[in-house]
């Protein structure tokens, strides 16, 4: 597989590159786009071939007969994650941000609290607030350099108005693969406080060697009556523009409520996205993912070695995802000055930690889903930008 080729995405209506200068002041011609969580790699050939077949046919009508897609989802979940899913449990959404919004709309009411384990994926908070719900932040604790859950502290934050818990598993931006014990703890917490659990597992295929992701239905089957699962091909295969995702619900009562809401919204599948996803969930796609994970792990090692060599900087150990979470807190520099050095001196666009909620204030998130040469260049620029610390 070729992950080393640098592809010019500037001028292709690409958020990551075409919006970098307007939002961050980093010019696309000389800057490095390491913010938006999509990768710089072309998807596997099977995905390209599926699109070429559609283009050759030349008629782009409404999508129907999703049996092949549903079987591909079921095959992937069983073979890659040991998770058995029935066809009638799978709903197709326009990506998982849309899926999250649908879950909030279906299972909560305006004014209800939605629990987030912060710092966490920034879109969650935005959607919750836009829907007229309340964000309830349950901060993660840093123990031995990585995030852990403090259920006793979280219990103390509950007021009785909370109705939903959104879990990011694996965790973005901290890169944690939650253990069976931690997942059991989340399940018990949701039972204790009568919360619907929405488990966003979009990064579940991007787990580093030596780590194992556990789907929540396997880790805690006892909460099937309050569990909503979310998965997608978009992160795994770098096809975010396809806007497709899965909401998977085992409980019939929850499933009926979600189906009614989807009908009321008039949603229908994206034909291009489902053709791409069907092709991706295949043996060829699986082989590509295996190679991708090895490559990202190599990027992680290069990045961590270079960043951690800068006194006071620390890249949190990455167990999953291609997103490095770097803490600048120990250097004693105002975060505005840190950002100024990264964006103006190093000319790197990253995600600011404040967007991820409580606990993210001293962090920046770097996207390592790129050619190795880009990672090497980013490290060199960071070392030069913070040379006075050495």
Label each PLM-derived region with a short phrase:
Residues 54, 61-94:
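Conserved N-terminal alpha-helix of the aminotransferase class I/II PLP-enzyme fold
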Residues 1-61:
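N-terminal "arm"/small-domain region of PLP-dependent enzymes with the aminotransferase-like
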Residues 1-12, 67-69, 73, 130-136, ...:
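Conserved long hydrophobic alpha-helices within structured protein cores
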Residues 26-32, 36-53, 84-86, 91-390:
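PLP-dependent class I/II
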């Amino acid at each position: 597989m070729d992950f080393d080729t640098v592809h010019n995405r500037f001028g292709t209506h690409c958020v990551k590159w075409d919006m970098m200068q307007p939002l961050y002041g980093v010019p696309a011609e000389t800057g490095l786009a390491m913010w938006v969580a999509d990768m710089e790699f072309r998807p596997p050939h099977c995905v390209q071939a599926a699109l070429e077949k559609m283009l050759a046919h030349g008629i782009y009508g409404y999508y129907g007969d999703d049996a092949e897609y549903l079987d591909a989802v079921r095959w992937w979940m069983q073979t890659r994650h040991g998770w058995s899913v029935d066809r009638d449990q799978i709903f197709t959404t326009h990506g998982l941000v849309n899926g999250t919004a649908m879950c909030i709309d279906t299972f909560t009411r305006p004014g209800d609290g939605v629990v987030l384990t912060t710092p966490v994926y920034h879109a969650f908070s935005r959607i919750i607030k836009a829907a007229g719900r309340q964000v309830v932040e349950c901060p993660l604790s840093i123990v031995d350099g990585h995030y852990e859950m403090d259920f006793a502290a979280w219990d103390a934050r509950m007021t009785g108005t909370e109705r939903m818990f959104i879990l990011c598993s694996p965790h973005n931006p901290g890169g944690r693969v939650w253990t069976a014990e931690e997942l059991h703890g989340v399940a018990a917490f949701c039972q204790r406080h009568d919360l619907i659990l929405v488990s966003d597992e979009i990064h579940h295929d991007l787990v580093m060697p030596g780590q194992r992701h556990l789907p929540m239905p396997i880790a805690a089957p006892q909460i099937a009556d309050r569990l909503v699962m979310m998965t997608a091909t978009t992160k795994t295969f770098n096809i975010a523009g396809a806007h497709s995702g899965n909401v998977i619900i085992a409980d019939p009562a929850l499933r009926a409520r979600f189906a009614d809401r989807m009908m009321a919204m008039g949603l229908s599948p994206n034909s291009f996205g489902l053709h791409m996803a069907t092709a991706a969930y295949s043996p060829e796609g699986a082989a590509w993912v295996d190679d991708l994970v090895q490559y990202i792990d190599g990027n992680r090692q290069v990045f961590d070695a270079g960043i951690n060599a800068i006194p006071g900087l620390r890249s949190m150990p990455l167990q999953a995802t291609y997103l490095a979470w770097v803490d600048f807190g120990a250097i004693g520099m105002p975060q505005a000055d840190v950002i100024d050095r990264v964006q103006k001196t190093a000319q790197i666009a990253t995600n600011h930690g404040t967007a991820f909620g409580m606990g993210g204030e001293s962090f920046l998130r770097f996207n390592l889903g790129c050619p190795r040469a880009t990672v090497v260049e980013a490290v060199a620029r960071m070392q030069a930008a913070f040379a006075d610390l050495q």
